Amino acid sequence: MSYIEKQEFLTELKTRNILKDISSPEKFFNLKPDQGIYIGFDPTATSLHLGNYISISLLKRLQKIGIKVLAVIGGATGMIGDPSFSSKERKLLDFKTLNANKEKIKKQLESFGLPVFDNFEIYKNMNILDFLRDVGKNINISYLLAKESVASRIEVGLSFTEFSYQLIQGWDFKFLAENYQIIGQAGGSDQWGNMVTGLDFIKKSNLVQKDEAFVFTTNLLTDENGQKFGKSLGKPIWLDPEMYSPFHLYQFLLNQNDEQAEKIMLWLSFLDLKVINELIFKHKNDKKQRILQYNLAQEVVFNIHGDKGLKIAKKITKILFEKLDYTEITFKDKLELKKIIPYFKVSFFNANQIIDLGIFKSKRELNEFISHKALEINGSKISNIGDITEELKDKSNLFLLRKGKKYFFIIELI
């Protein structure tokens, strides 16, 4: 990739409002074909979330233009917990949990076509004396204390364990530069202090690459309330489809306001800027159609969950919101619905049972819905309370109830 092409790439990141800071644009422009860039992912949960996808999509953008990339799982850093701009100390994970998290996140990252390295490999044979002599000797304590991410925690308390986090992240960078020709590091803007520590380790080394290393950060994608996107409303938007379904992600994106939709489209989609601007223009001319939101939902769900996930999300959306004919609802659709709408298992099925389940508050309310022809079971409109029998079950012993226009339930007869 040429010098000019790298300039154009950086300009596009700025236009998309992805890029926040870069230590040296010139060093990025002079990146050699055998040199690369990495981003770290700590295994603090069994899945990455939408906030992490900003970093994943950045690695994919770099990969697409021919730059070598590496996703680094924090097997070592994850054992400590990053204190950066955190108001309290993070709970330490036990080894069993950490290893289980690592395996799942490794598979997630690999599913996006990214090569993966576990930083635990760097430290597994290093003892405390090695660490103090090789790592600790190369950094000044006053320099570390002056960092904003550390200073903000000093008054409320910061353990030596968390204080060491930036040393390990910094040493990662030096190790990767020395052994894998990874001379660039990227990350969220809250990682700047930790990343610069790595630059300092490299500059003080005897590496031939010591004057070539650089770091750059991305803006943090936030919701309309200024909260990090991965943890909107206190519920992480997981990338694992079993933890946060493609349907829920599709609906989440579909319901973004215009300003947020435009921002997320620029950040998370791989559509050409010209195409995005055309979509924004069309949307502004006919906002009722929500052209921007529909295209955003399609792009992001497809990129994360593939064509299969997108088809499921769109099909469930049709079932729940567009009055799809019951004959078009397959058994697989019902299995997906079980993850999304209230699901019950029963040993018998009748009117009293669905009242006992809380679907209706009383027999009176049930009769009101029936009289207004507002109750369907497996596609059949119920006209009499006595029609609610087990004979309505499908071949899989399932009942799909539609109460009014908005409420759906699945009941399984066992």
Curated annotation (Swiss-Prot):
Gene3D superfamilies attached to this UniProt entry: HUPs (3.40.50.620), RNA-binding S4 domain (3.10.290.10), Tyrosyl-Transfer RNA Synthetase (1.10.240.10)
Gene Ontology CC: cytosol
Keyword list, A-Z: Aminoacyl-tRNA synthetase, ATP-binding, Cytoplasm, Ligase, Nucleotide-binding, Protein biosynthesis, RNA-binding
All residue ranges annotated as the S4 RNA-binding domain in the record: 349-414
Major place of residence: cytoplasm
Pfam families linked to this entry: SYY_C-terminal (PF22421), tRNA-synt_1b (PF00579)
Top-level lineage group: Bacteria
UniProt xrefs under InterPro entries: aa-tRNA-synth_Ic, Rossmann-like_a/b/a_fold, S4_RNA-bd_sf, SYY-like_C, Tyr-tRNA-ligase, Tyr-tRNA-ligase_bac-type, Tyr-tRNA-ligase_bac_1
Entry's Gene Ontology molecular function annotations: ATP binding; RNA binding; tyrosine-tRNA ligase activity
GO BP, one annotated term: tyrosyl-tRNA aminoacylation
Motif residue range(s): 'KMSKS' region: 228-232
Record-listed L-tyrosine binding positions: 38, 165, 169
Catalytic activity: tRNA(Tyr) + L-tyrosine + ATP = L-tyrosyl-tRNA(Tyr) + AMP + diphosphate + H(+)
PANTHER family xref list: TYROSINE--TRNA LIGASE, MITOCHONDRIAL, TYROSYL-TRNA SYNTHETASE
Assembly and binders: Homodimer.
UniProt-recorded name of the protein: Tyrosine--tRNA ligase
Organism per entry: Mesomycoplasma hyopneumoniae (strain J / ATCC 25934 / NCTC 10110)
